[in-house]
């Protein structure tokens, strides 16, 4: 049986992921304590089911510590994949504000005057919500490492659905490569497996004609391709990824996220990410995401 275990931060998109699984024919259960998954899998297998999707989160926090043990047991008989969805605190606060829902760990009284809470209160933010989010992040951190992580902070719903569909795909392939451009001034992507810094490359930003463009526009491409340093770094990154890709495949990875960062995430990192994606598309499944441009492809 194929089992997809979804966990992660409240408000990060687990319901969207579970809906994608359900649309794909999975038998789906939300908020099931981990210790009950093996029994459910046995029952469903006896009934002829071949695909199971389970979401478990902080609402079942007493059973979260049993997840690694449960996954080990399940993998003796089933094909098990773990998916961990996360998002920045700022993004989660905004989502809760829009939906007006209460976080599972929110406390209304007796909040400590932590530095984060004092700063948040000065900005008029809900300190109980921020504290709950950070508490949840700490409690869930042991589950993030063994799972495939997706940071949904800037993802549109349709892009998240596309990633989930690729993640659960039954089509034979070794691994899916995600090349993600970003700007260091906005923070490093939390779901990156490899991070490359290209800030030392010549910057089109200082050309007033190129400044409003992106690394996908031909004038910027022409500028960067005329720089030997840019081509050399792109080749070095390509060679590194290609050399170590078999090791990630041998580690049973379904995804490998390669993040390319420049200062603002508009020119150099976008160009390098696109160049790498073009090369590796001939080798398998490739996705591209330009975080600061809010573009997925």
Swiss-Prot record:
Physiological role: Displays ATPase and GTPase activities.
Keywords, ordered alphabetically: ATP-binding, GTP-binding, Nucleotide-binding
Species of origin: Ralstonia pickettii (strain 12J)
SUPFAM superfamilies linked: P-loop containing nucleoside triphosphate hydrolases
InterPro entries per UniProt: P-loop_NTPase (IPR027417), RapZ-like (IPR005337), RapZ-like_N (IPR053930), RapZ_C (IPR053931)
GO molecular function: ATP binding; GTP binding
Residues involved in ATP binding: 8-15
Family statement drawn from the similarity comment of this UniProt entry: Belongs to the RapZ-like family.
Pfam families: PapZ_C, RapZ-like_N
Positions that bind GTP: 57-60
Name of this chain's protein: Nucleotide-binding protein Rpic_0258
């Amino acid at each position: 049986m194929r089992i997809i275990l979804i966990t992660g931060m409240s408000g990060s998109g687990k319901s969207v992921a579970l809906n994608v699984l359900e649309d794909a024919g999975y038998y789906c259960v939300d908020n099931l304590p981990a210790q009950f998954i093996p029994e459910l899998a046995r029952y469903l297998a006896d009934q002829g089911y071949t695909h199971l999707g389970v979401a478990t989160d902080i609402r079942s926090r007493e059973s979260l510590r049993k997840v690694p043990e449960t996954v080990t047991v399940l993998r003796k008989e089933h094909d098990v994949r773990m998916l961990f969805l996360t998002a920045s605190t700022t993004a989660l606060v905004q989502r809760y504000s829009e939906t007006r829902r209460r976080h599972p760990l929110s406390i209304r009284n007796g909040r400590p005057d932590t530095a984060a809470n004092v700063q948040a209160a000065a900005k008029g933010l809900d300190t109980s919500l921020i504290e709950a989010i950070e508490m949840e992040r700490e409690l869930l951190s042991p589950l993030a490492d063994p799972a495939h992580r997706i940071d949904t902070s800037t993802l549109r719903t349709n892009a998240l659905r596309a990633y989930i569909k690729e993640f659960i795909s039954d089509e034979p392939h070794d691994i899916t490569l995600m090349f993600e451009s970003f700007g260091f001034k906005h923070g490093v992507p939390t779901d990156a497996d490899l991070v490359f810094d290209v800030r030392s490359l010549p910057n089109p930003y200082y050309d007033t004609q190129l400044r409003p463009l992106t690394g996908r526009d031909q004038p910027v491409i022409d500028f960067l391709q005329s720089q030997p340093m840019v081509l050399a770094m792109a080749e070095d990154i390509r060679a590194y990824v290609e050399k170590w890709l078999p090791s990630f495949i041998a580690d049973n990875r379904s995804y490998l996220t390669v993040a390319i960062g420049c200062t603002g995430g508009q020119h150099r990192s976008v160009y390098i990410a696109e160049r790498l994606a073009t090369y590796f598309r001939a080798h398998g499944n490739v996705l591209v995401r330009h975080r600061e441009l809010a573009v997925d492809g």
